[in-house]
Amino acid sequence: MTFSNEPRIITTDDHPIRHHMIDKDAMKVLRILRENGYAGYLVGGGVRDLYLNKSPKDFDISTDARPGQVRKLFRNSRTIGRRFRLVQVFFHGKEIEVSTLRSLSEYDLDGPESVLAPNNTYGSLGEDAQRRDLTVNGLFYEIENNTIIDYVDGINDLDKSVVQFVGEPVRRITRDPVRMLRAIRHAGRLGFRISPESWQAICENHEKLTLCPPSRIRDEFFKDLHSGALSEWLKLALDTELFFDIFGLYKKPLSQKEGAEERPYREQLSAIAKVIDRCANLAKDSGKRGLANDFLLALLLVPWANANFDLVRQRVKGAEAFRFSKILRDELDKGLGIQLNLRRSIRQEMVILLSNLPQFLRYHESNSWPKWIKKKSYYKSCSLFCELYAESLTGNQAELPVSPLKQEYRSKPTEQSRSKGNRSRRKSYNPSFSSKKKGIFGLKK
């Protein structure tokens, strides 16, 4: 698709966005940029969601100011990023991301294709719009005239409920295959359809996703795991076969289109995805942190374990149980651990949840729990795991804990919060080099 250099301007009368709908801190950043002679625009998903009368998760801003210039305007900020530097401005535990307008590089326009080629040059508003992944995310909103600036026909796609790539689909996928995941994500979350050209490009090029770093694929998938729209994502990912480029271990159970075994396992996956969505939506509605990534990922792997090991019918004890868990761990490592660059501790937690499921299901069905198992360190997590799996079978909703289980891959605490926490737990002492009262010449008394 080719786009004009002249944008479409959508005026106040033709769109629903009003200033009171925008986060007050984002408005503050926009005003400060303007007052200091810089252009500032609300951009991307924030504009998309406001246009659709949804509540944006984030309010991102683009500007013609360079990162260093933005830092000078906001003392409560930091610069992050490797491929492209952007500034995070902090407001009471919340952050507003401010990026400098970028251009498509000459390499991207005319040169040979390559995965994740460098793209860190600054550019104009139109160039920035055309380097974005999807047309529905390529919109700009400016507060002075309350107008939406559209270089990529994104408003038309929003009105038609269509997701499509900015530019020629195959070329855009080749440049960065992760764009396929984002297209499926937004189609699933918004309930949109993917344009025929973009859909065909994904179906024909899905295997290119394996060229991306495993950690990047993992982090992108975890966004979908907690999106509340995993079941919609799953359907699209399976139909395009992109799912198998992430979960190669599912290829055998689900690959035979007419096979007798395919329907049950696909139905199991779909039912589990709906349970995960319920958990994610409850966490978002309550403002609390959701269940851990390893916990939800293990839940999504139960149909695979059933297909390969007849998991829920296992009756093993003692040394035999240990051998089974080791086999499970080895297969998990080969099929997913390396592919998603999962830490060893994460893989071990997943094996504990999966290998204990048969035993916990038996106690769950009889509603009789031995005292010894309640004393195990893994009792709470395994019992909840069992209840959520049972929910996927029966539809009877499990009761979720008030405090979520430990979340892996969570963001690191700030230095300030870390030091406070350590002070409250750490025993006070004077080191041997102390110069305080109880020491003599810097030595302990």
Predicted features by range, described:
Residues 1-445:
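Catalytic cores of the polymerase beta-like nucleotidyltransferase superfamily
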